[in-house]
């Protein structure tokens, strides 16, 4: 799969590179986070949310809405699934990493999605991006054998456990956590996911 760069114009349909933030302390805090052989995701880390840049991200990035700052770390080379939220997500790449992304508009009426439409973008270490709400995304892929580390900023409560019953039809069947609609690939066998990704479980070599 051809790997593009988030600095390329082709990324502008999916999101944008963010400027004007000082992530020095946030990147330092990320040094204390584990990088497992698989993938781990923690929605909220108090130490990160206590940093001055957190208030800046809340006000500049989300117009004052309460936010959570967490991380996604590990080793991965495959798509496995695609999710979307009702809001943008801000990522800060601590290491070089690759995002496999698509457009929500390409999801069919039966909530299937053709994985041949997925595009790959390198996010260089130290780069912050906004990933638009209509951009399908999931866990990053590592570039270096030591794995990937990525800061994840979202509206508070996103990706936390559902506290209400959901229907098993329509878009509701994709809702696996608060503000998280997920389409899985059968090869990945993600627990609770609707396996609507059709085609290869694409990845990077």
Sequence positions of predicted segments:
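Active-site region of the double-stranded beta-helix
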Residues: 1-125, 139-147, 151-205
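Histidine-centered metal-chelating micro-motifs
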Residues: 127-129, 134-138
């Amino acid at each position: 799969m051809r790997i593009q760069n988030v600095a390329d114009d082709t990324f502008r349909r999916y999101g944008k590179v963010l400027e004007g933030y000082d992530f020095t302390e946030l990147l330092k805090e990320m040094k204390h986070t584990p990088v497992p052989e698989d993938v781990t995701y923690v929605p909220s880390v108090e130490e990160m949310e206590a940093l001055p840049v957190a208030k800046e991200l809340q006000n500049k990035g989300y117009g004052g809405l309460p936010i959570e700052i967490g991380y996604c770390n590990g080793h991965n080379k495959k798509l496995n699934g695609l999710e979307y939220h009702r809001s943008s997500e801000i990522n800060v790449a601590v290491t070089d990493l690759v995002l496999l992304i698509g457009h929500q508009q390409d999801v069919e009426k039966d909530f299937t999605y053709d994985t041949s439409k997925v595009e790959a973008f390198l996010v260089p270490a130290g780069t912050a991006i906004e990933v638009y709400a209509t951009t399908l995304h999931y866990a990053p892929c590592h570039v270096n054998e030591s794995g990937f580390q990525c800061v994840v900023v979202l509206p508070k409560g996103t990706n936390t456990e559902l506290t209400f019953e959901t229907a098993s039809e329509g878009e509701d069947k994709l809702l696996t956590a608060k503000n998280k609609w997920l389409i899985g690939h059968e090869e990945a066998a993600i627990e609770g996911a609707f396996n609507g990704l059709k085609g290869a479980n694409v990845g990077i070599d």
